[in-house]
């Protein structure tokens, strides 16, 4: 594409951005044509196709004014986090060590990208902490925890997601559901600490 066409394409792109910013909706093809001094609407369509091909805009040809600016930050770097079985957020179930799948998680979704894994939550014992049945819990691997941390704990080879409290002579794994009682233990193995939740709507 020659320089004049590139310049005109940039004019079209910048005009669309300006209109969306100022008015909240994109311009029509005729408005673009007039604003940037193109001779015909077919010339506008040519530039729109180029912008779409370059990933700068999205269009819906079945609708008028259906032009959307693609956020350049939407193409974010991701990390593939392993999904390790299914644990319970109710009664503990047998811990599953095999990796069932991997999940492409945006790298800016979590602070620490090392030693992460995900577990699918099953049950309602953590609903008052906003953790629902079917959520994917993002876990940072660690064998220690502070009071109040939500952890994945291993109890008799079974894993559970609970809030951790180290009392004077025992460990309390507290559900976030008033209808459920805490689990009291002399000791337990911490597998990891909750750092985030991913939920599909």
UniProtKB/Swiss-Prot annotation:
The record's section on InterPro entries has: ArsR-like_HTH, LexA, LexA-like, LexA/Signal_pep-like_sf, LexA_DNA-bd_dom, LexA_repressor, Peptidase_S24_LexA, Peptidase_S24_S26A/B/C
Q: Keyword annotations for this protein?
A: Autocatalytic cleavage, DNA damage, DNA repair, DNA replication, DNA-binding, Hydrolase, Repressor, SOS response, Transcription, Transcription regulation
Q: Which domain of life is it from?
A: Bacteria
Tell me which residues form the DNA-binding region. 29-49
UniProt entry tagged with the keyword Hydrolase? yes
Q: Which reaction does it catalyse?
A: Hydrolysis of Ala-|-Gly bond in repressor LexA
Gene3D superfamilies found in the cross-reference section: Umud Fragment, subunit A (2.10.109.10), Winged helix-like DNA-binding domain superfamily/Winged helix DNA-binding domain (1.10.10.10)
Site note Cleavage applies to: 89-90
One GO MF term: DNA binding
Keyword hit for Transcription = yes
- Report the active site residues: 125 (for autocatalytic cleavage activity), 162 (for autocatalytic cleavage activity)
Q: Name one GO biological process term.
A: SOS response
Note the NCBIfam families from the entry.
lexA (TIGR00498)
Q: Which family does it belong to?
A: Belongs to the peptidase S24 family.
Q: This chain belongs to which protein, by name?
A: LexA repressor
Source organism (scientific name): Clostridium botulinum (strain Langeland / NCTC 10281 / Type F)
Q: Which gene encodes it?
A: lexA
